[in-house]
Amino acid sequence: MKGEPMTATRSQRRDCPDVSPICEVFKMLRRLMLWVGVLAGTAGSLATAQGLTPNASLAKMQLPEGLRADLLASEPWVRQPVAIDWDDRGRLWVLQYLQYPNPEGLRRIEVDRYSRTRYDRMPAPPPHGPRGSDRLTILHDDDGDGRIDRGHDFLDGLNLASGFAFGHGGVFVLNIPYLLFYPDRDRNDLPDSDPKVLLTGFGMQDAHSVANSLMFGPDGWLYGCQGSTVTSNIRGIEFQQGVWRYHPATDRFELFCEGGGNSWGLDFDAQGHLLYSTNYGGHLLLHGVQGGYYVKSFAKHGNLHNPYAFGYFDHAPHTNFTGGHVTVGGMVYQGDLLPESFRGKYIAADLLGHAAYWHQIQPLGSTFATRHGGNLLQSNDPWFAPSDLTIGPDGAITIADWHDARTAHPDPDASWDRSNGRIFRITTWQSPPRAAPFDLSLLTDMQLMDEILHPVSANAWKKRRSRQELVRRYGSLAGEKIEQTESFNALIERCRDAALRSDEPSGALEALWTWISLRHGRA
C-alpha cells in the first residue's frame, strides 16, 4: 500500500449536530464500524487515524539543516508501535502494543492512586493464556523505494508484549509477566514451536511501566529495563525500577542495578558503559554500573531492596534541560550516515515534547554529565509521540511514533485510538532511500570478524549484529552442543590476537567482547 492510508483530517469531517438523536445513532454506528475494522487488523479498514494523515504529520516536522525525515511505514501495517529493530537481513520489525493498557482475560481487583492494578490471577504464557491483541510484525520494502509495501506477523495473540530482541537462533520476547524465547532456526519467519519460558515474575501492575527495552550487551548478556510502578519478583529477587539482565546460555538472571525512574530505553557506548533513560524531571539518563543503587521516588516506589545499601547514586547531572520529562529510546549514536558531529552524541525521544533531541556526554570523574545540544526532530503535530528509536544497518535513525493525543492511562477504562502508528527514518539529503540488500548469515566466520574489527566502519549496528550471528552459530541455543571445531578455534585465536595486538583500543574491546560472547555462548 504505497499511498496515504485512507483517513480524514478534522477539517474534512462532516459531523451532524450533536443535538440530534438520529445523529447520535449514526455516530455510534460509525464508531462501531471503526472499531470493528481496527480490531480485525485488516489492511482495508476505511476509517483510521483521528489525527493528521501520515504525510501531513511528516510535513509538520522540523530538522537541522542537512537532515531529512521520510515516512517509512504507517497504518495499517503499524499501529501503537512500542519497540522497533532491524534484523540481520535488513528488515524492520515492530512490536505493536495494541493490548495497552489492560491485559486480556484478567479481572481487576483493585487500582490505587498511582494506577497500580491488582488482577485476579497471573495469566498462563502464550499460547495457553488469554489471547491478546499485541503482535510482532516484519515489515517489507519489496521494491526498494524506502516505503513499506507489506507486513506479516511473526507473532500475534500476545498479551502485554513490551520488548523483543534477536539472538541465539530466534527471538526473545517480553510478554509480561514472562520472558519468552521463540526459536526460528530455519529462518522461515515462523516460530519453530511454542515459546520456551525463560523467566517468570515481571510485574504487570501498570502497563506503562512494565519491563522493556530488550537488547544484547557487548558481554553476551540480554539486558532490559524495569519501569517504576510495577514490582517484579524473579527467582526470589524483588525490585521495582532499574536494569536487569539474563544470560541465555547459562540461564542466569541478575538485577544489574536498581533505581532511576520509569525507564524505557538503554544503550552501551563505544567503551561498553551502560546508559539508561529516565522520566525524572530535569534529568536525561543514568550511568548504570553493576551492583549500583540509584535514587527513586521512595515515597511512591518504596525503599531500595538491599537493606545494606546505605546510600545511592543520582542521575547524571544535566544542563539546559529542554522539553517534557519523559526520555524514551535513548541511544548513543554510533553510525556513519549522519554528519560526524552527531557521532557519540546521546539521542533520545521526548514523548511529551513531540521531539527527539541530541545531547553531549561529558566525562565527570568516573561517570558522566550531559548537556542538551539541540533538536534532531521537532514536530508541531500534537499527536506525534515518539516511543522508540534505533539505528539501522545504514546508520540512519529510525523513530517509532505511537501517534495518539495522550499516552498515560489514569482512567483504565478510557477509550484509545488504536488505529494508527508511524515509523520515520532520519537521514541526510544525499542518502539513498534504503540500505543495499544483504544477509549476514551468508558471510563466513572470518568475514563477520572483519565487520567486527573493521578499523574504519563506525556503524555499531554491523558490529553488534555480526557478533550475534557468530553466537547464533556457536551458542548453546543454536542447536546441538558445539564441540571445539577447527572453525571455532580459528575464531577464538583471531579474537585473542586482535585483543592483544590491535593498535586501536576500540578494536581490542570488540575482539574481547566477541571472545567473551563466544565462550559464554557455548554450553
Task: Identify the residue ranges that each predicted region occupies.
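Bacterial N-terminal signal peptides
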Residues: 29-45
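Beta-propeller blade termini and top-face loops
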Residues: 50-437, 442-450, 458-463, 467-523
